[in-house]
Structure formats: structure tokens, C-alpha cells
């Protein structure tokens, strides 16, 4: 990861960081850094399921972190999607994603029971605005009942 996408502390240079797998932050999310025992800064979303535990138990290992003005690579975001199991629903959803120039479908898994499908889509997006637009478009697809960013 290149350090020009994030500003850590008072713009500390050369810090190694990784995006936490528990919450998969993307450009535009509110984030904080957690200095791991290996000395690597793990970047978490402020609404991460682990954030409260970190704040309570390790406040001294937290470091202020914010995004710089530069949008970098694509970030993986997982969406949970529920809807009516119709023929062509997956094709409709994937074509919506394929039409977005700033989004890439990375993974899809869908299960169907009793006429209802549930699935997870992993998409590559450059920022939260792109993700919100994509969620809005997918939610308007015929048969889709709910689309949310998964944690």
C-alpha cells in the first residue's frame, strides 16, 4: 500500500499499514489506525465491529488517520444482497456493475431457497461515493429487495 492515500498521525512518512480484513475500509470511510503488536498500523473503519473493543482496551495504540486528497487504487467492498429468485437476476446485477466505469466485480456467491436468493458480491471501487451509487443502482434492479454493505 502506498502511503500517499492515507495521512497517519501528523503526516508520519514511511509507516507500514494494512487495511483491516474485519471491516475492509475504502477511500472515504471514516478510519483510524491501530498499531499492532508487529508494529504495522492496521486501518479500521470507525464503525468496525472491533472498534469499540480497541477503543476500550488499547486507546494508547490508536493513531489518528485520514485519507489524503488522492484517490488511489480500487478497494474491495462486500455487499449483502437479498431478493426474489428470478431467472436472470444475477445477469441483471452483474450487468449493472459492468456498466459502472469505476467498479469491478471481483467475486459473487448466491444461494437460493424457497424463491428467495441471498448473496454476497465483492466489488472493487475507488471510493465510498462510487459504492453508494452502485448500491442505489443495484437496489433498483427488478427482484432485488435489499442491498447493504457487509461488515
Located regions from the model:
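Charged, surface-exposed alpha-helical interface/stalk elements
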Residues: 116, 124-129, 143-146
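Short hydrophobic/aromatic beta-strand micro-patches
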Residues: 82, 122-124
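N-terminal non-catalytic structural scaffold regions of very large proteins
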Residues: 1-80, 85-90, 99, 106, ...
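Short, well-structured beta-strand/strand-turn elements
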Residues: 103-106, 144-147
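Short beta-strand micro-motifs in enzyme catalytic cores
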Residues: 77, 117-119
Amino acid at each position: 500500500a502506498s502511503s500517499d492515500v492515507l495521512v497517519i498521525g501528523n503526516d508520519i512518512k514511511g509507516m507500514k499499514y494494512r487495511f483491516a480484513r474485519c471491516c475492509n475500509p475504502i477511500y472515504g470511510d471514516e478510519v483510524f489506525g491501530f498499531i499492532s503488536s508487529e508494529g504495522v498500523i492496521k486501518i479500521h473503519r470507525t464503525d468496525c465491529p472491533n472498534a469499540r473493543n480497541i477503543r476500550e482496551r488499547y486507546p494508547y495504540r490508536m493513531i489518528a488517520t485520514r485519507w489524503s486528497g488522492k484517490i488511489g487504487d480500487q478497494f474491495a467492498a462486500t455487499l449483502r444482497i437479498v431478493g426474489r429468485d428470478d431467472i436472470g437476476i444475477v445477469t441483471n446485477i452483474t450487468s449493472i456493475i459492468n456498466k459502472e466505469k469505476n467498479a469491478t466485480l471481483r467475486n459473487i456467491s448466491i444461494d437460493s431457497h424457497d424463491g428467495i436468493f441471498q448473496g454476497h458480491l465483492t466489488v472493487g471501487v475507488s471510493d465510498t461515493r462510487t459504492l453508494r451509487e452502485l448500491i442505489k443502482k443495484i437496489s433498483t434492479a427488478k427482484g432485488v429487495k435489499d442491498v447493504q454493505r457487509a461488515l
